[in-house]
Amino acid sequence: MSYVNDVLQNLIAKNPGEAVFHQAATEVLESIAPVIEANPAYEKAGILERLTEPDRAILFRVPWVDDQGKVQVNKGYRVQFNNAIGPYKGGLRLHPSVNLGVIKFLGFEQIFKNSLTGLPIGGGKGGSDFDPKGKSDREVMAFCQSFMTELYKYVGADIDVPAGDIGVGAREIGFLYGQYKRITGLYEGVLTGKGLTYGGSLARKEATGYGLVYLMKEMLATKGESFEGKRVVISGSGNVAIYAAEKATAFGGKVVALCDSTGWIYDEAGVDLAAVKQIKEVERKRLREYKNYRPNAEYHEDGVIWDVPCDIALPCATQNELHLEHAETLIKNGVIAVGEGANMPSTPDAIHAFQKAGVLFAPAKAANAGGVATSALEMSQNSLRLSWTFEEVDQRLHGIMVGIFNQMAAAAEKYGHAGDYVVGANIAGFVKVADAMLAQGVV
């Protein structure tokens, strides 16, 4: 542990004020300590020092003109963290909370998530503190074109392939891709999450949510449980939450609550997903509109969604949204399983509480890997100049998620932590990347 502790202390000292990056690195490094101790070659080669330092961190300004003719300037980021097993791969996040520490945390997590998929993709992440909410289509286009005018220098189908994340959906990907193509003249798979008319993949929108539920299904089965007849609470109302709800419902669960950034809905009869899709995907409005479709449902702007009793909880909104007190409430109300659809949505003390109480817990880097897995399948289709059917992509996704579960379960058991999927996911993701780094020398 002394080597691990030394690396962590050095990381914290060299990256002050980046709390979420410290949190992510601490969780991973502490859980892989048994592997490090069993393999002295990792320390000799400085694997941890190299793994926790990005290959490069790109920071740039993004000037654009709003609808009033005023010049606005945002910060743009792309952190290319590790490409030992493939080109950098990870989303772009547009949100006021974005800073270098947030992007580094997301990029670091992406290394292990991408490794777990079994596909040849490295880890990266990017974004900006630009807020697309309340902006016109023209303003979003102006921002995206300016952002790509700088980013295009650093990305490419075999170099770095960004995708969507919070604030970046089909509209934004379209604007970004159009500008890349205009500047470079290249029609290549440089972005994933593209529209179906210009190289996108069927099932990409559904992938993260579906993948989460596929993995949860495997995990529940280890205890003789399933989604059938279970009450499910899901935070968020974006792609991950909506399609996790859709697949959980298909497996016999009853989704009773969803939320967005202004409030949450509770529908004892089961959430009407058609209404939610209309509100969020078509009208781009708030969940408060849900009562117009289901008058008997409840809408709350106070309290938290985790107060709703449930059997299965799926945090799918944002990092550190589920705290210790929320975990204690869920445990008291009889939750049996928690799966992270967002990136690091549970605080460390919340995770510890779930594990101590015997609640099945699926960490984000495994549970939400379906999105990036299907992005990699989109890359494959672009390279092959083919388009697979929805069923074929979904079948491949299901196989990948089963494989991820089996990997992390086996790794946890091998190192004496059977049933601890946090440790299992970290170890399984780490070993593949570390061994590739060893093979490639000190680079």
Can you describe what each PLM-predicted range is?
Residues 2, 16-23, 27, 42, ...:
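Conserved active-site and cofactor/substrate-binding residues in soluble primary-metabolism enzymes
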Residues 95, 114-228:
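Glycine/serine-rich phosphate-binding loop and adjoining beta1-alpha1 elements at the start
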